[in-house]
Amino acid sequence: MKRNATHFLLLGCCLLGGVLSAVSLHNHYSASPTDYCDLNDTFNCDFVNRSTYAELRGVPVALVGLLGYLLLFALSLSTSRLIAGFRFAASLIGLAFALYLAYVEAYILAAWCLLCIGSLAAISAITLLAGIGLRPARDFVSTAPHEDGIRSELPNPIDTQ
């Protein structure tokens, strides 16, 4: 991915997701309620952040998210094609996990966390932008001649030359 507006938007979404996860992690361990995020029974971050689904084997989900966003940010600093593939794969894993958590919020807890919704929006945007940053497979085949004069591209079956 070249360093253009899309690239900087990707970095910004990684930072946004990281900040949302960090705030959610702070709220997870905080004893005081979060007035800004507890609107009613349907939108209640404290309820979601302190539920049994807020941890995976004792590790807060918000910490997993924070580490994931840090990884995506680090991968987004590179313009390598290979790293772009890893970045897209990592974002797909993050999106799948965020969609699972949204399912838990909607159908099991019947409560939504505004920070979690923001994080879902961030990882969705990251996945979209990481996908845009991928180049078509044909770009991986070089058309430059090698030292021995043989071109490294595959023959085109449509060419009749």
Task: Label the model's feature ranges.
Residues 1-159:
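Membrane-interfacial helix-loop segments of redox and metal-homeostasis proteins
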